Amino acid sequence: MDSAAPALSPALTAHTGHSATADLAIQIPKCPDPERYFYTSQCPDINHLRSLSILNRWLETELVFVGDEEDVSKLSEGELSFYRFLFAFLSAADDLVTENLGGLSGLFEQKDILHYYVEQECIEVAHSRVYNIIQLVLFHNNDQARREYVAGTINHPAIRAKVDWLEARVRECASVPEKFILMILIEGIFFAASFAAIAYLRTNNLLRVTCQSNDLISRDEAVHTTASCYIYNNYLGGHAKPPPDRVYGLFRQAVEIEIGFIRSQAPTDSHILSPAALAAIENYVRFSADRLLGLIHMKPLFSAPPPDASFPLSLMSTDKHTNFFECRSTSYAGAVVNDL
């Protein structure tokens, strides 16, 4: 993984025959920009998101998955297969996002953006570790069974459709702004249906701590997509934006793939994910696309209505109060609207 570009960007020169300490020489430009050597706020919107991320930091060790293992036995065979599949995808996709963050941060010199990406990388690590725990819960702590399942699932056509589409779009990507459109689609669309399907466990009082972690992770991703939208809008001035038809085409394709993903894997024997619930999830994916288009100052593509009050992810927007029996408060400080 590429690391975030340091403010100093020193050139390190090796000299044969000297100690390791003596081999490092820092070269400072003859006419340096003084702002490279101290912090100056240049991106107030991104700085706000960094502060929000710090305020809402959490660790996988704060979540105790007591009771979730017992709930696994309450899932039907189709439901268990479905949720194992979702978490195999989310775990793999989350690691891919982490690997790409260093490359994005290296495009900028503004410290607010660099500092923000440090925070995002840190929380993505927590996501990855939580997904590991949840996968083990779904496999009754049988690590070998989990490994064999992931090895046989990671190239499933529904997952490959997302990966192949993304790889093709990256290869043909003509500009830096288009790369940010792809990041918005990865975190804002390609996770949306999975987050919603997991949230439906809450309505059946199942896997309570898994649902708490889903609250936290989906809210984090809302911050991340907002940051990508802000950067796309405000900090890519030297790069031409892709034409509207191109952006709309990418959004339309991503939504079609995401809806196909959830349809192809939805269990047929489920009391958790009814046909009405699946229709609500599909509408939510379209609504999320329209909202993200609005964040980058474009008109909606689908004109999808917002989810109604019974949609489980909407419960995350209400104020929550920690009680004695909660393992971790999922209240989120700050006023970032969650669309995931």
UniProtKB/Swiss-Prot annotation:
Pfam family, one: Ribonuc_red_sm
Enzyme active site: 131
Biological processes per GO annotation: deoxyribonucleotide biosynthetic process; DNA replication; release from viral latency
Cofactors that this protein relies on: Fe cation
Gene3D superfamilies the UniProt entry points to: Ribonucleotide Reductase, subunit A
Positions with a binding annotation for Fe cation 2: 124, 187, 221, 224
Membrane association type: Single-pass membrane protein
Membrane-spanning intervals of the chain: 180-200
Cell compartment(s), UniProt: Host membrane
Superkingdom of origin: Viruses
InterPro entries xrefs: Ferritin-like_SF, HSV_RIR2, RNR-like, RNR_small, RNR_small_AS, RNR_small_fam
Catalysis performed (reactions): a 2'-deoxyribonucleoside 5'-diphosphate + [thioredoxin]-disulfide + H2O = a ribonucleoside 5'-diphosphate + [thioredoxin]-dithiol
SUPFAM superfamilies, alphabetized: Ferritin-like
GO molecular function terms attached to this record: metal ion binding; ribonucleoside-diphosphate reductase activity, thioredoxin disulfide as acceptor
Keyword Transmembrane helix attached: yes
Keywords, ordered alphabetically: DNA replication, Host membrane, Iron, Membrane, Metal-binding, Oxidoreductase, Transmembrane, Transmembrane helix, Viral latency, Viral reactivation from latency
Record text on subunit structure and interactions: Heterotetramer composed of a homodimer of the large subunit (R1) and a homodimer of the small subunit (R2). Larger multisubunit protein complex are also active, composed of (R1)n(R2)n.
Family the entry assigns: Belongs to the ribonucleoside diphosphate reductase small chain family.
Function: Ribonucleoside-diphosphate reductase holoenzyme provides the precursors necessary for viral DNA synthesis. Allows virus growth in non-dividing cells, as well as reactivation from latency in infected hosts. Catalyzes the biosynthesis of deoxyribonucleotides from the corresponding ribonucleotides.
Name of the protein: Ribonucleoside-diphosphate reductase small subunit
Species in which this protein is naturally found: Human herpesvirus 1 (strain KOS)
